[in-house]
């Protein structure tokens, strides 16, 4: 039996996390929903969605840096000789856009379509008890995304439980990866999902037990954007072998206020900045 390889990657930098405290993301929309980015790192344009611009509050897009991260990671996969035959991703917009960036970086955006799998969505606890609303595959197709419109998912959005426990989330992830593997019996698979997915999609596949909540959160907090993990199989036995590409590291670049150059009371600005930084470290 030939070796099979599965690569699981976290999405790129998201707008709400990058700009949540500054307000620049939400304030880029006016009262009529017209969008004008207030920071160079905010996306220049946004896709139209049936639920209106308000839908971006719970289904955030990538930042410009997030999309660049995706393309650079795709290039790294290509440079390391990684071949991909099947692609699946979470229905979250940030995962959709990350998938597009990865395929572009690999030079596969004209050759491979990806399938949107709701079973790969993040733990429902993070949905904050509001059922998520995504852009449907048929609408993504109309917007130009290379989506397999006729794909039959393992899970539907209505099957995702709002009271999902951590054990339920592990089982959903494990069930999704098993269904994908049963349908794609040959070739290598790329899965683009969430930070926790690198753990929950592989843990039971390689014979591990569901982790404690504390251990789960530790791993989640130490899985940065575009992290990648590989599992491979010989004779039907799966093992985790690390990542086929190096880590993606860069520094945090804060918002610049040009008016500070003409402000006399820099002490008050310093206190305000330190307060914001302290809030950031506790989130």
UniProtKB/Swiss-Prot annotation:
Keyword list, A-Z: Cytoplasm, Hydrolase, Protein phosphatase
pH dependence: Active at pH 4 and 7.4.
Compartment list: Cytoplasm, Cytosol
Gene3D superfamilies: Phosphoglycerate mutase-like (3.40.50.1240)
Active site (UniProt): 10, 11 (tele-phosphohistidine intermediate), 194
CDD domains: HP_PGM_like
Superkingdom of origin organism: Eukaryota
Lineage, opening ranks: Eukaryota, Metazoa, Ecdysozoa, Nematoda, Chromadorea
Stated role: Phosphatase that dephosphorylates some steroids such as ecdysone 22-phosphate (E22P), 3-epi-ecdysone 22-phosphate (E22P) and 3-epi-ecdysone 2-phosphate (E2P) in vitro. Also displays acid phosphatase activity towards 4-nitrophenyl phosphate (pNNP) in vitro. Has no activity towards 3-epi-ecdysone 3-phosphate (E3P) in vitro.
Gene Ontology CC terms: cytosol
Database matches in Pfam families: His_Phos_1
Name recorded for this polypeptide: Steroid-phosphate phosphatase
Annotated EC: 3.1.3.-
Uppermost EC category: hydrolase
GO molecular function annotations of the record: acid phosphatase activity; phosphatase activity; phosphoprotein phosphatase activity
Keyword Cytoplasm among record annotations: yes
